[in-house]
Amino acid sequence: MGQKIHPHGLRLGITSDWKTHWYADKDYANYVAEDIKIREYLEKGLDRAGIADVVIERTRDRVRVDIHTARPGIVIGRRGAEADRIRRELEKLTGKMVALNILEVKQVDANATLVAQSVAEQLVNRVAFRRAMRKAIQSAMRQPQVKGIKILLSGRLGGAEMSRTERYHEGRVPLHTLRAEIDYGTAEAHTTFGRIGIKVWIYKGDVVGGVRESELNAPAQGRGRGDRNGRPRRGGQRRQRAQQKQEG
C-alpha cells in the first residue's frame, strides 16, 4: 500500500499538512477549480524559478498564495515588477484580492520537487541519466536532515527504442511507516526522444510527539559577513604575545 499511494496523501494530518486552507459549503467545486488554475499558471509561467510548493489560503474576499521557490529573485523581478504582474494576473483569474507571499527554500538538495526538477533539466541538456541520478543522490545525502533517497526514472532512457524504468536509492525510505516524514516530488523531462518521468522520495526522519527529527538535524544558521563578534580577528594572538613580552 505504501509503495503505491501518494506519500503526502497517506500522511495527511500525521506528518504532512494540507496545501490549501479554506472552507466552502456550496462553492467547493469552484474553489478547487480555481486552485488548479492558480497552480497551473504558476508552474507554466515560472518554470525556471524552481517552484517547490504552492500553498493557498482563502478568506471571504481575499486569496493568499504562498510560493516556496529556490530562486526568489526571478519571482520578485526588478523592484517587484514581476511579483506585481503575477498578482494582477491571479486577481483576473480569481476575481478577488490576491496577496503574494514569496518564501525562499534554503535547502534545495533536501527538497524532493526541486531534486526532480534538477534531474529533468539535466536530462533535457543531454546529460546521461545514470550520472544525473547519481549526482542528485550524492548531493541530497550530504544534507544532515536527509536519511535516505529514492529516485525513479521512466521512459525512453538513453534514447532506447523501448521504454523502461530505472531506480536508484541510498539509505532508508520507509514508505509504510506513517510517522516517517517522506518528501515526494515529480517532474517531466521533455527530450527529443519523448517524455521521461521522474519521481523522488526523500526520508527526513520520524515525527514523534509533534517534533520533527529533520528540524533537529537541520544545519544552524550561519553568521553574516558583517558579524565579526563571534570569530577571532587576524593578528589577535600576535598582539597578546607582544603584550606578554612587554610585561615580562
From Swiss-Prot:
The UniProt record lists the keyword Ribosomal protein: yes
One GO cellular component this record assigns the protein to is: cytosolic small ribosomal subunit
Q: Report the domain of life of the source organism.
A: Bacteria
The region called Disordered is annotated at 214-248
Alphabetic keyword roster: Ribonucleoprotein, Ribosomal protein, RNA-binding, rRNA-binding
PROSITE patterns for the chain: KH_TYPE_2 (PS50823), RIBOSOMAL_S3 (PS00548)
Q: Which GO terms describe its molecular function?
A: mRNA binding; rRNA binding; structural constituent of ribosome
The residues covered by the KH type-2 domain are 38-106
According to its UniProt entry, the function of this protein is described as:
Binds the lower part of the 30S subunit head. Binds mRNA in the 70S ribosome, positioning it for translation.
Quaternary structure (record): Part of the 30S ribosomal subunit. Forms a tight complex with proteins S10 and S14.
HAMAP family tied to this protein: Ribosomal_uS3_B
This protein is called what? Small ribosomal subunit protein uS3
